[in-house]
């Protein structure tokens, strides 16, 4: 430590302007000394005490606190914006669902109209099918009546007799000799034959007769 000693004049006994002055006896007065101001760098207690901080340290701490507060405010703002966006998305989905429900409640009337149209079309198709069936039945009845008329009419034997010689097969001598026997057996079947069984077979009509008048 540096101590600086200074000498001062002795004040009168009545004046006490210097409180640091001491007087033990009125005869002898000791001089007073002053200590210089100690700087923080020369103070060992200040260097040894880590808890005590100066004004610069306090400003640094305040600045770091402000940085954390800004980061916190930014994160809170981002979270709030995301939450707001989620709420908007859910509201949009709910609105779409509600709109679809209203549309489904309004649609049954046109569906009824379509069902009526379908029923009308089906009725028309059924009527057309019934008409076609009746026409087909009528055509079948007319064809059946025509067939019955053709069956009830007697066969035209003159047409069979007037057939061309090509239609009738030629008779061999063996079949000619067998004709009288077959005629006797078939006589009761042909009631329209006026010829007797004993006549010659040359009287039978055939396509290529060789008799001449």
UniProtKB/Swiss-Prot annotation:
Family listed: Belongs to the type-B carboxylesterase/lipase family.
Record's subunit section: Homodimer. Interacts with NRXN1 in a calcium-dependent manner. Interaction with neurexins is mediated by heparan sulfate glycan modification on neurexin. Interacts through its C-terminus with DLG4/PSD-95 third PDZ domain.
GO cellular component term of the entry, any: postsynaptic density membrane
Classification lineage: Eukaryota, Metazoa, Chordata, Craniata, Vertebrata
InterPro entries noted in UniProt: Neuroligin/BSAL
Gene Ontology biological process terms in this record: cell adhesion
Free-text function comment from the UniProt entry: Cell surface protein involved in cell-cell-interactions via its interactions with neurexin family members.
Residue segments, region Disordered: 1-56
UniProt-annotated location(s): Cell membrane; Postsynaptic density membrane
Main location: membrane
Modified residue annotations for Phosphoserine: 109
Iron-sulfur keyword on record: no
Membrane topology reported for the UniProt record: Single-pass type I membrane protein
Key words of the record: Cell adhesion, Cell membrane, Membrane, Phosphoprotein, Postsynaptic cell membrane, Synapse, Transmembrane, Transmembrane helix
Superkingdom in the source lineage: Eukaryota
Cytoplasmic side: 95-213
Protein name per the record: Neuroligin-4, X-linked
Ranges of compositional bias, category Basic and acidic residues: 46-55
Encoding gene (name): NLGN4X
Species in which this protein is naturally found: Macaca mulatta (Rhesus macaque)
Transmembrane segments: 74-94
Topological domain ranges for the Extracellular compartment: 1-73
